[in-house]
From Swiss-Prot:
GO terms for molecular function: structural constituent of ribosome. The lineage of its organism: Eukaryota, Metazoa, Chordata, Craniata, Vertebrata. Belongs to the universal ribosomal protein uS11 family. Disulfide bonds: none annotated. Residues 43-52 have a biased composition (Basic and acidic residues). The gene is MRPS11. GO terms for cellular component: mitochondrial inner membrane; mitochondrial small ribosomal subunit. InterPro entries: Ribosomal_uS11, Ribosomal_uS11_CS, Ribosomal_uS11_sf. This is Small ribosomal subunit protein uS11m.
Length: 197
């Protein structure tokens, strides 16, 4: 009975406290009597070896497909400009019209176009073809002022949302990012009644 009790306690002790190797400052200590000076020398030697190895090159895993947050440092450049310095194309897509304003990063107006200024009248202003034509016209005016890349900010739920972006790319502008800035009420004003067809 005593032998069984001793072997059981040995199993419990070996399971609870597994044997470990003595490691001090990343260097295994061969004996307990190793002097402090030898341990410091071994740790210093290891630090020198780590410092001599070159830093690894940035990997593809650190690259992000998403544009940087304004104010965040990034190495990405478009035509030599940072993300915050790229002009912005504001698209307001209502159900009756689509308006496009291209402004500089400092919010100075560069180009403006809408479906009405492109010759569409009445109900035709609210179509996708009219929005695409307005996008091409706004892109042509902006490229005439030296704009090559734009950030797009879309507001509204009209039928010309995507057509206007397509028109900007067809007009020669390269779209860097698309932001949806549509206002969403948190149960604000009462909406208009539904149409009966």
């Amino acid at each position: 009975m005593q032998v069984l009790r001793n072997s059981g306690s040995w199993l419990l002790r070996s399971w609870a406290w597994p044997p470990t190797t003595r490691v001090v400052a990343g260097v295994p200590a061969p004996t307990i009597h190793m002097s402090a000076q030898q341990m410091q020398d071994a740790a210093a030697k290891e630090e020198v070896e780590k410092a001599e190895t070159p830093a690894p090159a940035p990997s593809r895993s650190s690259f992000s497909i998403y544009p940087p947050i304004p104010g965040q440092e990034s190495s990405l450049r478009w035509a030599g400009k940072k993300f915050e310095e790229i002009p912005i194309a504001h698209i307001k897509a209502s159900y009756n019209n689509t308006q496009i304003h291209v402004v500089s990063a400092a919010h100075q107006p560069l180009a403006r176009a809408s479906c009405g200024t492109e010759g569409f009248r009445n109900a035709k202003k609210g179509t996708g073809i009219a929005a695409q034509t307005a996008g091409i016209a706004a892109a042509a005016k902006a490229t005439g002022k030296g704009v090559t890349h734009v950030r797009v900010v879309v507001k509204g739920l009209g039928p010309g949302r995507l057509s206007a972006i397509k028109g900007l790319t067809m007009g020669g502008l390269e779209v860097i990012s698309i932001t949806d800035n549509t206002p969403i009420p948190h149960n604000g004003c009462r909406p208009r009644k539904a149409r009966r067809l």
